[in-house]
Amino acid sequence: MTSKQLKLVIITGMSGAGKTVAMQSLEDLGYFCVDNLPPSLLPKFWELMKESDKMDKIALVMDLRGREFFDSIEPALDELDNTNFITTKILFLEADDKVLVSRYKETRRHHPLEPNGSVLDGINAERELLSDLKGRSQLVINTSNMAPRELRERINNEFQTEDKDVFNVQLMSFGFKYGIPIDADLVFDVRFLPNPHYIDKMRPLTGLDEDVYEYVMKWPETQTFLDKLVDLLMFTLPFYKREGKTQLVIAIGCTGGQHRSVALTEFVGKAIQQKYETTISHRDMKRRKGR
């Protein structure tokens, strides 16, 4: 039996306050997420998680959809408090009555406590029933004035670990003749640069070979472009991260994806990885190698 420590976040609170956004944010942070687990199943669930080597961060959404919620949530939490291998944090999301009513009207949903009655009556009943749980929560967030992006940013600030940057930049070279990568967020065309393909000895090589790399890099327009591109990315990447993105795919393309785009992708990747977790790949480099 393993003695590892599990981190548990219980997401709860008012219906319509943003629990789904919170769960998605924690999932992006590497949490194993379960939506609407009945409280009575918590002890068995913990034992299973404790035996897993792949799960050490868990987030559970627990709310009124669980019919036994109010009867069993308090005993389940008391049992967790006495469990030495789990560190528990309760995240309680709330919003003002006026805001919750407005959100229900926008989505045309009924309140779970008043499926055939007044939304406001359901909100008032839910708020009263959740008052004790709110009191024992370690983190309470009022989302009345928050857009989903702002809630994601708040969740990231509260829960991301210091030893892991959850924002990953993927640099990819490609050849336009084979199509633009469908998963690219940003695409840069470097076909304006001198092409080593027309030099016989370089034709079978790639941008990873020293001769090709130096040839591509020697041109003033290459250096000017790289200076501007790296500057642009260093300026914009923090804002993509702020928007809640956990991954950004940047594609750099030339004609065949063998020479220019490969060399520039290597250069840009090495510059970006000084600050961000970065993955470098060359989609089309081997298609023509040796021909």
Swiss-Prot record:
Keyword rRNA-binding among UniProt keywords: no
Pfam families: PapZ_C (PF22740), RapZ-like_N (PF03668)
Residues that bind ATP: 13-20
Gene3D superfamilies xrefs: P-loop containing nucleotide triphosphate hydrolases (3.40.50.300)
Region forming the signal peptide: none
InterPro entries: P-loop_NTPase, RapZ-like, RapZ-like_N, RapZ_C
UniProt superkingdom: Bacteria
Binding site for GTP: 63-66
Keywords: ATP-binding, GTP-binding, Nucleotide-binding
GO molecular function: ATP binding; GTP binding
Family as reported in the entry's similarity comment: Belongs to the RapZ-like family.
General function of this protein: Displays ATPase and GTPase activities.
Protein name: Nucleotide-binding protein LMHCC_0126
